Amino acid sequence: MNEVLEVIKNRRSIRKFQEKAIDDEKINIILEAGRWAPSFANTQPWEFIVVKDKKIKEELVVATAHDSIAQAPISILVIVNPEVDRMHHIEDGAIATQNMALAA
């Protein structure tokens, strides 16, 4: 079977995290997967922000109401700029996010 399809079928949502640091090499692989995502007219309207700081993650919990952010060793924020492409920026950001989720 196609390797990509296998990864898609075996993807899991993780809600409990270990208190173990994630290697920068692994983080870079995840970010690279996001950078390789397709986007409308190659506009790449995204920016990825890696958050490791516990205090900032706690502020993100308050802002998003997602408690699991505080327990995760890192969070990767996907920011999309509607000024780059007003019609497709949300979809482009979602595709980049999916690439990173599959790489993780």
Region spans (language model):
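Specificity-determining recognition surfaces
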Residues: 1-26
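Short, intrinsically disordered, charge-balanced linker/junction segments flanking boundaries
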Residues: 100-104
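Glycine/small-residue-rich phosphate/adenosyl-binding loop
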Residues: 28-32, 36-96
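A broad, low-specificity signal for short, low-complexity segments enriched in glycine/proline
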Residues: 5-13, 35-40, 98
